[in-house]
A protein has these predicted regions:
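Terminal processing/anchoring signals of secreted or surface-associated proteins
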Residues: 20, 303, 320-321, 338, ...
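N-terminal signal peptide c-region/cleavage motif recognized by signal peptidases
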Residues: 15-17
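Consensus positions within tandem repeat domains that build extended binding/scaffold surfaces
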Residues: 73-75, 95-100, 118-123, 141-146, ...
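C-terminal tail/sorting-segment detector
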Residues: 1-3, 353-365
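Residue-level detector of functionally pivotal "anchor" positions at catalytic/ligand-binding pockets or at interdomain
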Residues: 315-337
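Structural signature of tandem-repeat unit edges
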Residues: 33-36, 49-70, 80-93, 103-116, ...
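Cleaved targeting-peptide boundary
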Residues: 21-27
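Sec-dependent signal peptide recognition
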Residues: 3-9
């Protein structure tokens, strides 16, 4: 009986050892003995990684070679002393919160073997200035780079089909970003509160712009919505105070609540659709400068409903004042009722804001 208990104890000890955390040269791993792979993990007793870390492609444990294929959940989370890290080409996935709040990390190179970047993987890495996402990555997880306030630019590869919810939220240092034509959806709050963002190029592969996708991007001065987009989400462009005008393509059939609310600089909206899209509540809430809605020829009656009819509805394409060339001056200026308001004018100075006709063309002041 005593021998049986001893044998059972040895087997139990072996099983516990097999499941135990392994440390090799200062890095901790979980081993998968069924396929000889290893996952980098955090040390369960609270010790934090620091300095410059080089993760090997494989480790040798008790005579067995283990390939390092993943960086696990919270592996380097809150490692405030971590300054640099080298990830081998054997790694295919970066887990949720893997580098969360590593605020001294300034740069990182993701190898081409990685296909998945987990939720909040690099969130609040506030010193991270640049990062290159390889074209092996197909999706960017929830809040993957949220709060990376020093990040100035990022290139999204054309392997990515979806930009996850809050993926780049609070990246206040971002000034511009190009989205590849492989992307079909821009997730909720994907670029929310990127106050430094001045321009963004959305490809015609995108069909859906999520809730608050560009909310509070106060530096955004222009954006072109492609004719592939069918839905604009709740508060999608809310509080984009730098926007002065926006064109909504014919493809858009629905616009969510407060989509353009508090766009304090917005003066005009151009609609390409002959019938109004379905819209939510308070679409233009607190857009105090919004005066004019431009609609296709013959569409003014269709737009004679709320919220459109709360503004001056003008049919036809309207050129901006910047397109009036010097060769067209001096010219007579007429209001929309055909009354001459300024004879042989050199410009529109001195006239109140509104729409005017110059040489048969409509212009906005």
């Amino acid at each position: 009986m005593k021998k049986r208990l001893t044998l059972f104890s040895l087997l139990l000890l072996f099983t516990m050892t097999a499941m135990a955390q392994i440390e090799v040269y200062g890095i901790y791993y979980n081993l998968n003995r069924s396929n000889n792979t290893a996952e980098v993990t955090t040390y369960k007793y609270g010790t934090r990684y620091s300095g410059d870390i080089v993760i090997p492609a494989s480790i040798w444990v008790y005579g067995v070679d283990y390939s390092v294929t993943s960086i696990g959940y919270r592996a380097f989370c809150d490692c405030s002393g971590l300054t640099s890290i080298e990830i081998p080409n054997s790694v295919t996935s970066i887990g949720d919160y893997a580098f969360y709040s590593c605020y001294r990390l300034t740069s990182i190179e993701i190898p081409t073997s990685v296909t998945e970047i987990g939720e909040s993987a690099f969130s609040t890495c506030s010193s991270l200035t640049s990062i290159e996402i390889p074209n092996s990555v197909t999706s960017i997880g929830y809040a993957a780079f949220a709060g990376c306030s020093s990040l100035t630019s990022i290139e999204i590869p054309n392997s990515v089909t979806a930009i996850g919810e809050s993926a780049f939220c609070w990246c206040s240092g971002l000034t511009s970003i190009k989205i590849p034509n492989s992307v079909t959806t821009i997730g909720n709050a994907a670029f929310c509160d990127c106050s430094g963002l001045t321009s963004i190029e959305i490809p015609n592969s995108v069909t859906w712009i999520g809730n608050a996708a560009f909310g509070s991007c106060s530096g955004l001065t222009s954006i072109e919505i492609p004719n592939s987009v069918t839905s604009i989400g709740y508060t999608a462009f809310a509080s984009c105070s730098g926007l002065t005008s926006i064109e909504i393509p014919n493809s858009v059939t629905s616009i969510g609540d407060y989509a353009f609310s508090r766009c304090s600089g917005l003066t005009s909206i151009t609609m390409q659709r002959t019938t109004p899209p379905t819209v939510g509540d308070d679409l233009f809430y607190e857009c105090s400068k919004l005066e004019t809605i431009y609609v296709p020829v013959g569409a003014s009656e269709a737009y004679n409903v709320a919220p459109w009819n709360e503004y001056n509805i003008v049919e036809g394409e309207v050129a901006g004042i910047e397109s009036v060339t010097l060769e067209e001056w001096p010219a007579d200026v007429y209001d929309l009722n055909g009354r001459m308001v300024k004879a042989q004018a050199e410009n529109l100075d001195g006239l109140p804001k509104g729409v005017y006709i110059v040489n048969g063309k409509k212009f906005v002041k």
